[in-house]
Design a protein with these regions (language model features):
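Structural signature of tandem alpha-helical TPR/SEL1-like repeats
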Residues: 23-28, 57-66, 93-102, 129-138, ...
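Canonical positions in the second alpha-helix
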Residues: 33, 69-70, 105-106, 141-142, ...
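TPR/TPR-like alpha-solenoid signature
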Residues: 43, 80, 101, 116, ...
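Hydrophobic face of amphipathic alpha-helices that form TPR/SEL1-like repeat modules
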Residues: 44-51, 56, 79-88, 92, ...
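Short helix-capping/linker turns of helical repeat alpha-solenoids
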Residues: 35-38, 52-53, 72-75, 88-90, ...
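Terminal, low-structured helical/coil segments at or just beyond the last alpha-helical repeat
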Residues: 201-230
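Bacterial N-terminal signal peptides
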Residues: 9-18
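Bacterial N-terminal signal peptides that target proteins for export
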Residues: 1-9
Length: 230
């Protein structure tokens, strides 16, 4: 049985300026509020400078400055963003240990992407000692918040018995959740499990259904499996 590997990717920096306090913030308003010490504004200003949103000229040094200020004032989003800067080496020297530290701070505050990223670093042993039990812990927290990549990696840990007792039933459960959230690798793995009767009785109809969904998403392995099942 061919099972696709864990999703060892960390998402590129995708930031949003939407919040209840600043539905459509002007640059001048954000700058003023940031200078007054408001952490939401400091975070937003940092993101503007980091991404060039709203016509702001990118300035990584200033982005780092304002995100650091927001972090010191308790902004969870700033902690995550600083982690991403260190992880990608954007505006700072790439430093996996620092990335780990910032992801850990944001993860402790319930930030789902940070929890997933922390799980990945534990899983890979980057920025910290490899620890499957900790990877399981943080994937679980992010998965419970409905974060699809975490659902997928959690299923993979159950399937392989890494950091947790091996359980095809639990692997099937979490692959299903990820598959329903359009994770094509999860759709493929779920189809394989139904095809082979792992975690559930064999079910060719469901196997074909999930192979088809993965194939529709562009998975070449799923396309080959569908041909072999015709």
């Amino acid at each position: 049985m061919k099972i696709k590997k864990s999703a060892f990717y960390i998402f590129t920096m995708i930031f949003s300026l939407h919040s209840s306090a600043f539905a459509e913030p002007s640059v001048a308003d954000v700058q003023y509020r940031a200078q007054q010490g408001q952490p939401i504004a400091q975070y937003h200003l940092g993101i503007m400078l980091l991404t060039g949103e709203q016509g702001v000229v990118k300035n990584y040094e200033q982005a780092f400055k304002w995100l650091t200020a927001a972090d010191q004032n308790g902004s969870v989003g700033a902690k995550y963003s600083l982690g991403m800067m260190y992880f990608t080496g954007t505006g700072v020297e790439k430093d996996m240990k620092r990335a780990f530290e910032y992801f850990a701070k944001a993860a402790d505050k319930g930030h789902a992407k940070a929890q997933y990223n922390l799980g990945v670093l534990y899983d890979r042993g980057e920025g910290t000692v490899q620890n499957y039990e900790q990877a399981f812990e943080w994937y679980s927290r992010a998965a419970e918040q409905g974060y699809p990549p975490a659902e997928y990696n959690l299923a993979h840990l159950y399937k392989k018995g890494h950091g947790v007792a091996q359980s095809d039933e639990q692997a099937l459960k979490w692959y299903t959740k990820a598959a329903e959230h359009y994770e094509s690798d999860a759709q493929y793995n779920l189809a394989q499990m139904y095809l082979n009767g792992e975690g559930s009785p064999k079910n060719l109809q469901l196997a074909k259904k999930w192979f088809q969904q993965a194939a529709d998403a562009g998975d070449s392995d799923a396309k080959e499996m569908l041909k072999s099942l015709d």
